[in-house]
From Swiss-Prot:
Active-site feature positions: C131
Pathway in which this enzyme or protein is active: Aromatic compound metabolism; 3-phenylpropanoate degradation
One BP annotation, GO: 3-phenylpropionate catabolic process
Name this polypeptide is given: Acetaldehyde dehydrogenase
Length: 316
């Protein structure tokens, strides 16, 4: 099966890590162009050393390159504001081009591969939510397939060193996009997301805490669902793991808790603690937040490439 050519816009931490993953592990993808805006960026320099065509003139530079004619899929690892402009420009030049959005812009539907990739494989633009979303939404979905989820709250703690300027500029968008995706993809009636940039030295690995309030259900069934979901995520993010056993607390009807925006709640509280270790393709292993974003985007693009190849075969 012929490989589909891809470009990456954004030569920062996420874009560079993704490029290395495609070059090393791409099965149906061929790395064609790395796009940046800083001619001195490490990502562009590394791309050139690895034999990848580059431009430092942004999306306009990409569209002016001869390689652009053959590109089927573009990853955007810039910022939420830039992605809106990039999508418009690329869509005008190539209406059927596929965009995988690694910013919180969310023009297209949210995609968390283990939960809803099959439903979104033919979309022209998919949004990879956020690193916190990719790590925690599978856990919310694991509970919601067993019991009705009224509220889910996630806290993502990442090493400050792993957060580049794009991540820092998009903190508000991070919380908004993740909260919404907890509801839309995770199945919670109400979602909340919190991000912590941990300045500790040496840097600590990505840690995520997930609290889910649901109708009462079998705790064994919920724990089994969570363990099964964690294994499914590990298929494309090997460093993803439960830090300890799932914890449960029954909130009785005569002692309900009051949730802002939700009201009185009684039922089952499920607590999940996660750790995400990075594959250290570009940044060290503590940057699991980068790894889960780039691994999820890669898994999505691989499925898209297979779908495009099948369609091309059917058309022929």
């Amino acid at each position: 099966m012929s490989k589909r050519k891809v470009a990456i816009i954004g030569s920062g931490n996420i874009g560079t890590d993704l490029m290395i993953k495609i070059l090393r592990h791409g099965q149906h993808l061929e790395m064609a162009v790395m796009v940046g805006i800083d001619p001195q960026s490490d990502g562009l320099a590394r791309a050139r050393r690895m034999g990848v065509a580059t431009t430092h003139e942004g999306v306009i530079g990409l569209m002016n390159m001869p390689e652009f004619a053959d590109i089927d899929i573009v990853f955007d690892a810039t910022s939420a504001g830039a992605h809106v402009k990039n999508d418009a420009a690329l869509r005008e030049a190539k209406p059927d081009i596929r965009l995988i959005d690694l910013t919180p812009a969310a023009i297209g539907p949210y995609c968390v591969p283990v939960v809803n990739l099959e439903a979104n494989v033919d979309q022209l633009n998919v949004n990879m939510v956020t690193c916190g979303g990719q790590a925690t939404i599978p856990m919310v979905a694991a509970v919601s397939r067993v019991a009705r989820v009224h509220y889910a709250e996630i806290i993502a703690s990442i090493a400050s060193k792993s957060a580049g300027p794009g991540t820092r500029a998009n903190i508000d968008e991070f919380t908004e996009t993740t909260s919404r995706a907890i509801e839309v993809v995770g199945g919670a009636a109400k979602g909340k997301a919190i991000i912590v940039l941990n300045p500790a030295e040496p840097p600590l690995m990505m840690r995520d805490t997930v609290y889910v309030l649901s109708d009462e259900a079998s705790q064994d069934d919920i724990e089994a669902s969570i363990n099964e979901m964690a294994e499914a995520v590990q298929a494309y993010v090997p460093g993803y793991r439960l830090k300890q056993r799932v914890q449960f607390e029954v909130i009785p009807q005569d002692k309900p808790v009051n949730l802002p925006g939700v009201g009185q709640f009684s039922g089952l509280k499920t607590a999940v603690w996660l750790e995400v270790e990075g594959a250290a393709h570009y940044l060290p292993a503590y940057a699991g937040n980068l790894d889960i974003m780039t691994s999820s985007a890669l898994a999505t693009a691989e499925k898209m490439a297979q779908s495009l190849a099948r369609k091309a075969g059917e058309a022929a």
